[in-house]
UniProtKB/Swiss-Prot annotation:
Taxon lineage: Eukaryota, Metazoa, Ecdysozoa, Nematoda, Chromadorea
UniProt protein name: Nose resistant to fluoxetine protein 5
Subcellular location: Secreted
GO molecular-function terms, A-Z: phosphatidylserine binding
Deleted gene: phenotype: Increased resistance to fluoxetine-induced nose muscle contraction. Slow development, embryonic lethality and defect in yolk transport to oocytes leading to accumulation of yolk granules in the pseudocoelomic fluid and appearance of pale eggs. Reduced level of sensitivity to dihomo-gamma-linolenic acid-induced sterility. Cell corpses persist significantly longer than in the wild-type, indicating a cell corpse clearance defect.
Recorded family membership: Belongs to the BPI/LBP/Plunc superfamily. BPI/LBP family.
Encoding gene per record: nrf-5
Assembly description: Interacts with ttr-52.
Domain of life from the UniProt record: Eukaryota
Signal peptide segment: 1-20
Transmembrane segments: none
Length: 551
């Protein structure tokens, strides 16, 4: 009896542990996009950073530093050796990293006030054999907290050199202490505070009293987004450097207005509207010895509003994010949030106007029969919210419903020729044949089913019969055949996007999501050239930005 009781107790304990593990997983909110990084990706990024830091820091002259007690000017960084960087995932905890730097030199001019005494002069600080060892642990209990459980900053030598007779030499020990303290704070405190801040970010709904509309940044300030855009720009146009675009003088295109001759684009979106992405960390970082997975909401925001009709899925198959340096699982939730805004705010409505001389061939004969001197207005609007569904076997299917009308406008008459209520199911299932350089994209399945097609107007009956026969039975099969032949024969080259080249890419489908597993490489020389050119252009108009000075 006692033996049976112990067996029963053991089984109950195992079940409770299992339920506890399940419940801890359920406490994480579902996410729209999951990203997995493996150790290979971290090692590659660490190697890139090791090469990049000396190139970025050497000969850099940061802006002046002004505090209540001191003013430091003429800062100049040099003799930055290539550091050794390494990072390793810690199962269930976080990440450990090590940085070792052989040498670092900075020169400056300082003015320091202590009570009634003033000290000023040039000095040079040289740091040797700097070593940083740290562990960042991520803990989740309703909210994510980050702490540096291990943080050691050591150096073999910190020397200060002053000109003969400099009054600053009297403060040598205090200056050394400030430098070491600033290093330790940057590594042990600032990084933790920054990560904790990022983990806690949530979008504030517009109805909240704390809501603030995003303001445009300083056009003369340093912008990561602007730097990224410059990284994506083409350097040359017809063999000549496009320097104006590189410096941000980009020519903009004005949207069509109702006075344009050929077209009118009507939409409820105004110039004051803005888009955003919900970057809430719904699934906090989880770690094994081999990888890290993080989940972001990823939903599209319009004027700060979330898409209420798009629902996050509780269960997504994340186990297949296990093949390459980076794995991305993109839920159907994200495009459906975009479709929600497009439909709710009438952003999918448009009108296009043709003059008699600019009519497409398909409408020229119809124009001669109805009104040869009229201009033609084609309009369309969505009648239902588009819905995207992803199936592991079928691919991604978009359901579109809308009204289409064609009207001929004369001086005295309006000819209402055509109204169509149409529903389309567009199914796409691309695959990627991984190639080291490009990777071919194959459009393996394209199926469109047209149903509920009703037409009005004087030519409704003959046109409806023509569309009912030609579109599904004649036109679409030929288009589909040509598409499949072209895509499968030649493929579409994956571009090198902003210096990032995808390699050995694999694209798969699971229920409700798309999986992308890929290796990647990064064009570091391109980034360094763009970074220095961008900073040089910005520093000429903003004295508060760093600049490169060769001494």
């Amino acid at each position: 009896m006692s033996r049976n009781f112990h067996i029963f107790f053991l089984l109950v304990s195992i079940i409770q542990v299992g339920n506890s593990a399940d419940s801890s997983e359920i406490t994480h909110k579902p996410a729209g996009i999951y990203v997995r990084l493996n150790q290979k990706a971290v090692d590659y990024v660490a190697d890139l950073a090791s090469d990049a830091l000396p190139a970025i820091l050497n000969n850099l002259s940061p802006p002046d530093i002004v505090t209540d007690m001191a003013k430091i000017t003429k800062l100049h960084i040099s003799n930055v050796a290539k550091p050794n960087l390494s990072a390793k995932f810690i199962d269930g905890k976080g990440v450990a990293y090590n940085i070792s730097l052989a040498s670092f030199r900075a020169s400056a001019y300082a003015e320091i006030s202590v009570f009634v005494w003033s000290y000023e002069g040039d000095f040079t600080a040289e740091l040797r054999e700097l070593s940083i060892e740290s562990e960042l642990h991520f803990d989740y209990n309703g909210t994510t907290t980050v702490n540096a459980s291990v943080c050691n900053v050591t150096h073999s030598e910190l020397s200060l050199v002053f000109p003969p007779g400099s009054s600053l030499s009297a403060l040598q020990s205090e200056i050394k202490g400030q430098i070491v303290s600033a290093l330790r704070d940057a590594v042990c405190t600032t990084a933790v505070e920054a990560l904790t801040f990022v983990m806690a970010q949530k979008p504030i709904p517009p109805e909240s009293p704390n809501y603030q509309k995003p303001e445009a940044g300083d056009p003369n300030g340093f912008s990561v987004a602007e730097l990224g855009a410059s990284l994506c720009q083409v350097d040359t146009v017809n063999g000549f450097e496009d320097s104006e675009q590189e410096e941000g003088n980009v020519e903009t295109t004005v949207a069509p207005t109702p006075d344009d001759d050929n077209s009118t684009l009507t939409t409820e979106e105004t110039q004051k509207s803005y888009w955003g992405v919900d970057l809430s960390v719904n699934h906090p970082p989880t770690f094994t010895d081999e990888d890290m997975i993080i989940g972001l909401d990823g939903g599209i925001l319009f004027n700060g509003w979330k898409a209420d009709s798009a629902q996050q899925l509780q269960i997504l198959n994340k186990t297949r994010l296990d093949k390459k340096m980076v794995g991305i699982l993109l839920s159907e939730y994200i495009p459906n949030t975009l479709f929600h805004h497009i439909y709710m705010y009438d952003l999918g409505n448009f009108k296009h106007r043709y003059t008699p001389s600019s009519l497409p061939k398909i409408l020229q004969k119809l124009s001669k029969a109805v009104c040869s001197k009229c201009y033609v207005e084609v309009s369309a609007n969505l009648t239902e919210q588009p819905i995207l569904q992803i199936d592991a076997h079928l691919g991604a299917r978009v359901q579109l419903s809308g009204n289409v009308s064609i009207m001929f406008h004369g001086r005295e008459q309006l000819h209402d020729v055509l109204h169509a209520n149409t529903k389309l199911h567009v199914t796409l299932k691309p695959t990627v044949r991984h190639s080291r350089i490009f990777g071919d994209v194959s459009l393996t399945n394209v199926d469109v089913n047209v149903f509920d097609l009703g037409l009005g107007g004087p030519l409704a009956a003959p046109i409806e019969k023509l569309f009912s026969f030609v579109v599904p039975r004649v036109l679409w099969p030929q288009v589909k055949k040509r598409l499949r032949f072209a895509m499968n024969r030649r493929g579409v080259k994956l571009p090198i996007f902003c210096g990032v080249e995808l390699e050995h890419t694999e694209l798969d489908f699971v229920d409700h999501a798309v999986l992308l597993n890929t290796d990647f490489s990064f064009d570091l020389p391109l980034f360094l050239a763009k970074f220095k050119k961008y900073l040089d252009a910005k520093s000429k108009i903003n004295p508060n930005l760093p600049k490169y000075v060769i001494i």
